[in-house]
């Protein structure tokens, strides 16, 4: 067991466990703690603690400090998969989120019970990145996008083969969601068309439209684009979809199975044709070779105002990472290269570049 003394020694900070210090009887004021904190992080947060927080119970120092806190609160749940998915726990998490708390989604893997599933506390590195990203956004003191309508699409699409199989990609939607949160933080009215992912934006003010297939993504994107001032196409839309979809599970046969594919509709090209003079259209390009040339060609061909280039050659960038390294090219052929950063920081860089094009 890790004792308070061990934590105090390693962190070189006092460790508060109870209302009264066991050494000298001094009162640990939960009110002072609540007022002093810039951010309240509860990690790990058990089902018991989450339930008490949702109910407003204050029977220990952690809970009384939470009720006294005027700062942002981040909660990192950690429990067995069945406890996490229980309706009571989900209801409690919903209550906490609706009260403005930030929920750091638990990860999946081996649990203390020996089972495998969702419920592990997010990795410490991920929690730190969430906190850093939050404070990076808090540095924005103005609302330069106030009154602007921003449409963003994000995440993958899934193209069904039969009722149990589909074609998709590794996109987590993290980059597009970070863009939506950054735009909302700058005062924009944000609509997010989101493919099938587990992540959700932090801001409660974002209008999220959930879609699954490329066809649904296209329909929702076209509709959202009609009324927006700025569009950012961050979704990883499937380039191909099965020519036919079986309504029954395809059984394993003795021979090979051939799936005929047809191209999906090009959303960026369609919106480029629809674009009005007062609209700004931003695309993304994921390249493996001749990156700048290919991205510049896509920008011109699809009538984009700006394109964000990701290279699969860059370690720590692209799908499946919480970091990204981008190059931005605008229609005047200005090229801005950025270092590897968290996706929250990258989102802020992209929005700042957009601001130079709309003002």
Curated annotation (Swiss-Prot):
Domain of life, source organism:
Bacteria
UniProt cross-references to HAMAP family, sorted A to Z: CoaBC
E.C. no: 4.1.1.-, 4.1.1.29
An example of a Pfam family matching this protein is Flavoprotein
Q: Tell whether Lyase is among the UniProt keywords.
A: yes
The family line of this record is: In the N-terminal section; belongs to the HFCD (homo-oligomeric flavin containing Cys decarboxylase) superfamily. In the C-terminal section; belongs to the PPC synthetase family.
**InterPro entries, sorted:** CoaB-like_sf, CoaBC, DNA/pantothenate-metab_flavo_C, Flavin_trans-like, Flavoprotein
Name the reaction it catalyses.
L-cysteine + H(+) = cysteamine + CO2; 3-sulfino-L-alanine + H(+) = hypotaurine + CO2
What is the role of this chain? Catalyzes the decarboxylation of L-cysteine to cysteamine and of 3-sulfino-L-alanine (cysteine sulfinic acid) to hypotaurine. Also catalyzes the decarboxylation of various amino acids such as L-lysine, L-glutamate, L-asparaginate and L-proline. In vitro, shows highest activity with L-cysteine as substrate.
Query: Which stretch is the leader sequence?
Result: none
Which cysteine pairs make disulfide bonds?
none
Q: How does activity depend on temperature?
A: Optimum temperature is 35 degrees Celsius.
Q: How is its activity regulated?
A: Slightly stimulated in the presence of 1 mM Mg(2+).
User: Can you name this protein?
Assistant: Cysteine/Cysteine sulfinic acid decarboxylase
A GO molecular-function annotation: FMN binding
């Amino acid at each position: 067991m890790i004792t308070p003394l061990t934590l105090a020694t390693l962190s070189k900070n006092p460790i508060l466990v109870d209302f009264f210090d066991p050494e000298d009887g001094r009162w640990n004021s939960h009110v002072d703690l609540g007022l002093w904190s810039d951010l309240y992080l509860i990690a790990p947060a058990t089902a018991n603690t989450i339930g008490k927080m949702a109910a407003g119970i204050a029977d220990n120092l952690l809970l009384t400090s939470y009720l006294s806190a005027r700062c942002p609160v981040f909660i990192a749940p950690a429990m067995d998969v069945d406890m996490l998915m229980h309706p009571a726990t989900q209801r409690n998490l919903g209550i906490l989120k609706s009260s403005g708390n930030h929920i750091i989604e638990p990860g999946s893997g081996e649990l203390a019970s020996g089972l495998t599933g969702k419920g592990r506390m997010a990795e410490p590195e991920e929690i730190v990145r969430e906190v850093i990203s939050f404070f990076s956004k808090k540095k924005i003191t103005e609302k330069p996008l106030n009154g602007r309508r921003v449409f963003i699409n994000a995440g993958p699409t899934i193209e069904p083969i039969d009722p149990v199989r589909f074609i998709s990609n590794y996109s987590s939607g993290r980059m597009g969601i970070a863009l939506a949160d950054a735009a909302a933080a700058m005062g924009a009215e944000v609509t997010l068309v989101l493919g099938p992912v587990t992540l959700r934006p932090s801001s409660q003010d974002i209008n999220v439209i959930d879609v699954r297939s490329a066809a649904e993504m296209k329909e929702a994107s076209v509709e959202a684009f009609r009324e927006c001032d700025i569009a950012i196409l961050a979704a990883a839309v499937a380039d191909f979809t099965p020519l036919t979809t079986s309504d029954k599970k395809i059984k394993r046969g003795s021979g090979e199975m051939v799936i005929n594919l047809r191209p999906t509709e090009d959303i960026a090209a369609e919106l480029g044709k629809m674009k009005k003079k007062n609209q700004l259209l931003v695309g993304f390009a994921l390249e493996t070779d001749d990156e700048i040339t290919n991205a510049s060609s896509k920008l011109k061909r699809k009538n984009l105002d700006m394109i964000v280039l990701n290279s699969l050659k860059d370690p720590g960038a692209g799908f499946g990472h919480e970091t990204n390294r981008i190059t931005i090219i605008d229609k005047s052929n200005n090229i801005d290269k950025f270092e590897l950063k968290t996706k929250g920081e990258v989102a802020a860089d992209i929005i700042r570049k957009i601001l130079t094009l709309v003002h």
